[in-house]
Amino acid sequence: MLKTLLSLTTTFLMFSTTISAQNKYFLTYYNKAEKLYQAKDFINAKLYYDSALKKNPMHAYSYFKRALSVYAEGNLPSALLDFNKTISLDPTNADAYNFRGDTKIRLKDTLGGIRDFDTSINIEPNNYSYYTDRGEAYYDLDSNRLALKDYTYAYKLDSTKYRAPFFMGLIYYYSEKFDIANALFKKCTKIDSTAPGPYFYRAKIMYNIDNYDIALDEINNAIRLFSENASYYVTRAKIYMFNESEYDDDMAIEDLNKAIKMGSEEARELLEEYFSEGHP
């Protein structure tokens, strides 16, 4: 009996030593992976998460971080597998559901993605990003009522962030509720004055209500912030064309030519129409 007990004790000590060594190596690999991940070296981070998981194949967070690493590199099928494994080991990880939802949407499974967004919101019902992510999915499906509901709730959670009021502005803009859209885009410019989108849409609103001076100011702001969008130049050309000055016509032609070089078919059609009307 004593011999058997001593044998069991020896076996337990050997097992404990093995587990301790595995934990030591796991932590070494995991900590190295985390440093690489923070440095945005996702390729090598993934390799160290691989090594960590060989030492501890039940560590849910390592699967999650490996999923994020391959997600960042654009390997969506592999990311999906690791998000699945994360959730199977830790079904309370709201971020895993949220990222899996985004991954599914990128893989053209929009409804599956929305179901994952639903779950992430059920786990963390006051997370701003979860609502804006689901709102964007609904927006892409043209489910504007549901999108607006999510963006409005997100905006109530945090009115200092840009994403919710911007998409709310888009929904109201395309519903031709220009007063509401304009107010939201103006709010966006105060939240982030470096984002060109709100200036662009404010320019389009002012153009639609024949306020060309303000429209020109706003589109100039958009182009100053981002000069590689053909639609910005087309919009400014349209504004110039409604002025009486021939100098403005010259600038409109210059803008249309810039947009054409960027591949804008609308600019090409506008320029052909302009000259077909007898302009020199």
Task: List the predicted regions and their residue ranges.
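N-terminal leader/linker segments that initiate helical-solenoid repeat arrays
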Residues: 19-65, 72, 276, 280
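Terminal, low-structured helical/coil segments at or just beyond the last alpha-helical repeat
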Residues: 25, 241-242, 246-280
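Helix-start (N-cap) detector for alpha-helical repeat units in TPR-like alpha-solenoids
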Residues: 25-27, 60-61, 94-95, 128-129, ...
